[in-house]
Amino acid sequence: MSAVRRALPEDAEEVLRLRQIMIDSLFASDPSIAWHAESLPTLRAKLGEPDGDFVAFVVEHPERPGALACLVAGTIDYRIGKAADPQGMVGFVFSVATDPDARRRGYARACMTTLLEWFRERGARRVQLTASPQAEPLYVSLGFRPKPDPLLELTL
C-alpha cells in the first residue's frame, strides 16, 4: 500500500477533486466546480501551515502519477473545557474521500489512523465526524460511537 503523507499546497487541486467526489456522492447539490477556483488560494495557504489547526492526509494514486487516491481532512477547535475535557480541544473529521477506482484497499483507514494520531499529539480528547451509511462501519471499527446531537445550524 502507498504511504500516507501530509497534503502539501501543491496537492490543493487534487484535494478539491477528491472533496468533490465526496460531495457528489452524499448530496444532491450543484455539480458545478466553479467554486474550486475561489477555494484554491485559501486551501493552499492552509495546507502550507505546518503548525495550524487544519490538516489533510493523503495517499498517492498507485496507477495515476500525480493523482491522489485518498484524502482525509480534519481540524481542531477549542471549546471551553468541562470536567471530562478540561483543555477543550476537539477534533473534527471531514472530507474523507477515496477515488472510486482506488476503494477497498485500506487507504481511508490508513489516513484516518494518521489523522487520529495527529489529533492525539495536539491534545484533542474527543473527535467528531458525520458519517455516511457506507462509511459508518469503518468509523465504528476505529472506536467512534453514534451520539444523538441536537445540533442546529444557521447559514449566514
Residue locations for each model-derived region?
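Conserved acetyl-CoA binding element of GNAT-fold acetyltransferases
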Residues: 84-100
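A short helix-loop-beta-strand connector motif used in the catalytic cores of GNAT acetyltransferases and
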Residues: 44-58, 92
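Conserved acetyl-CoA pyrophosphate-binding loop and the N-cap/start of the following alpha-helix
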Residues: 102-114
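Conserved catalytic-core motifs of GNAT/GCN5-like acyltransferases
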Residues: 76-82, 88, 128-130, 134, ...
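Conserved GNAT acetyl-CoA-binding A-motif
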Residues: 112, 119-131
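Conserved beta-strand in the GNAT
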Residues: 58, 66-76, 92, 97
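Conserved GNAT-fold acetyl-CoA-binding loop/helix
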Residues: 23-44
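A short beta-loop-alpha structural element at the N-terminal edge
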Residues: 3-17, 28
